């Protein structure tokens, strides 16, 4: 800042005409001002904080070598990429295989679901189920003699049930016998009276009746008289 006013004052004192144009002078003064500003800024940075050390030539050469190696590695990788893309074995190994489906089994009124069940195991399970079903059907069909034995047992048991059902109780038998005798006696009386009426109305009377004491042929005569009276 001190140089700029000094030059202006010296020019005025000398009274000489400026050799350079005002534009060039202002540009030079501006460049000097900027240089002084930069110098002051560098000095303040050096006081406030440490300056970074300048890179050595060895470090620069090492970084260049490392960059060359990285470029070589990248070039070799780019050359190897088409081989990876074209190789089908690598594709198969890296490509994820298809997920195995689920297996659902209905057994004893329940639904069982197995995740990621391979198809080979499913075929084995089906074969085992068919074998067990065939064995069970064979064991059920093998003994045909069982129904015959059951029928025989049923036939042998039938008379026992019939006898037990036919045998009346003593109380019921007495009541039935008491009811049958008066009915029979009243029926006989009715038939005798009817027979007498028929004989009285007929053209001739039947005198071939046997005495009441004959017990051997009493029942067939009563039956014949019943049939005769009913026919009339």
Curated annotation (Swiss-Prot):
Residues 96-131 form the Tify domain. A motif (Jas) lies at residues 183-205. Keywords: Acetylation, Cell membrane, Jasmonic acid signaling pathway, Membrane, Nucleus, Plant defense, Transcription, Transcription regulation, Ubl conjugation. Coiled coil: none annotated. Ubiquitinated. Targeted for degradation by the SCF(COI1) E3 ubiquitin ligase-proteasome pathway during jasmonate signaling. (Microbial infection) Acetylated by Pseudomonas syringae HopZ1a. It is found in: Nucleus; Cell membrane. Its main location: nucleus. Residues 133-142, 158-167 have a biased composition (Polar residues). Mostly expressed in leaves and flowers and, to a lower extent, in grean pods and roots. Residues 10-19, 190-199 have a biased composition (Basic and acidic residues). A motif (Nuclear localization signal) lies at residues 182-189. Pfam families: Jas_motif, tify. Residues 1-24, 133-232 are annotated as: Disordered. Induction: (Microbial infection) Triggered to degradation by the pathogenic Pseudomonas syringae HopZ1a protein in a COI1-dependent manner, thereby activating host jasmonate signaling. Transmembrane segments: none annotated. GO terms for cellular component: nucleus; plasma membrane. GO terms for biological process: defense response; regulation of defense response; regulation of jasmonic acid mediated signaling pathway; response to wounding. Signal peptide: none annotated. Repressor of jasmonate responses. Belongs to the TIFY/JAZ family. (Microbial infection) Interacts with the pathogenic Pseudomonas syringae HopZ1a protein; this interaction leads to its degradation. The jas domain (183-205) is required for interaction with COI1 and Pseudomonas syringae HopZ1a. This is Jasmonate ZIM domain-containing protein 1. It comes from Glycine max.
């Amino acid at each position: 800042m001190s140089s700029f006013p000094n030059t202006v004052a010296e020019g005025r004192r000398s009274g000489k005409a400026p050799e350079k144009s005002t534009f060039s002078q202002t540009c030079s003064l501006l460049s000097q001002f900027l240089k002084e500003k930069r110098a002051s800024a560098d000095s303040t940075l050096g006081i406030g904080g440490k300056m970074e050390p300048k890179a050595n030539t060895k470090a620069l050469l090492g970084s260049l070598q490392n960059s060359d190696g990285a470029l070589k590695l990248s070039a070799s990788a780019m050359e190897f990429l088409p081989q990876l893309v074209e190789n089908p074995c690598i594709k198969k190994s890296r490509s994820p295989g298809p997920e195995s489906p689920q297996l659902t089994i209905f057994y004893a009124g329940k639904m069982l679901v197995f995740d990621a069940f391979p198809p080979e195991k499913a075929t084995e399970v089906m074969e085992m189920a068919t074998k067990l079903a065939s064995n069970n059907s064979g064991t059920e069909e093998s003994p045909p003699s069982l129904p015959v034995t059951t029928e025989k047992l049923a036939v042998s048991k039938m008379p026992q049930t019939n006898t037990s059902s036919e045998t009346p109780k003593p109380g019921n038998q007495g009541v039935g016998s008491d009811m049958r005798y008066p009915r029979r006696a009243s029926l006989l009386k009715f038939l005798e009276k009817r027979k007498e009426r028929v004989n009285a109305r007929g053209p001739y009377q039947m005198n071939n009746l046997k005495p009441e004491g004959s017990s051997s042929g009493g029942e067939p005569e009563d039956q014949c008289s019943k049939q005769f009276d009913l026919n009339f």
